[in-house]
Amino acid sequence: MVFSEEQKAAIYYKDGPALVLAGPGSGKTTVIINRIERLIRMHNIEPSSILVITFTKAAAISMKQRFLSLVGDSYVSVTFGTFHAVFFNMLRQAYNYSAGSIITADTQYSFIRDAAISFELE
């Protein structure tokens, strides 16, 4: 694949986290997976220290599949996930939380409703 100068800059950047913003179909996923591959192979970055966060579960799964098809199964320790999944895993590991420990949407709504009613009465 031929990359633009902007894409090359993102792929070759190695000094810390990178935020890749671009429109649909612009090659973001390809750039990200090529950057990860380069970090591991050229800069000896430990795969388990790489975290890739996306907005949707489908995007995370797709990106991981595309990454593994590029590099093979030798780098399965790279973490791909959504914001929610990544932060839930942090809570689970740090505090032994389970899915039942997380407040439900109904409870959230009730709490906010009760707080709003209380605020209006005072």
Residue ranges, per PLM feature:
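ATP-hydrolysis module of ASCE/P-loop NTPase motor domains
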Residues: 14, 75-77, 96-122
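P-loop NTPase Walker
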Residues: 1-98
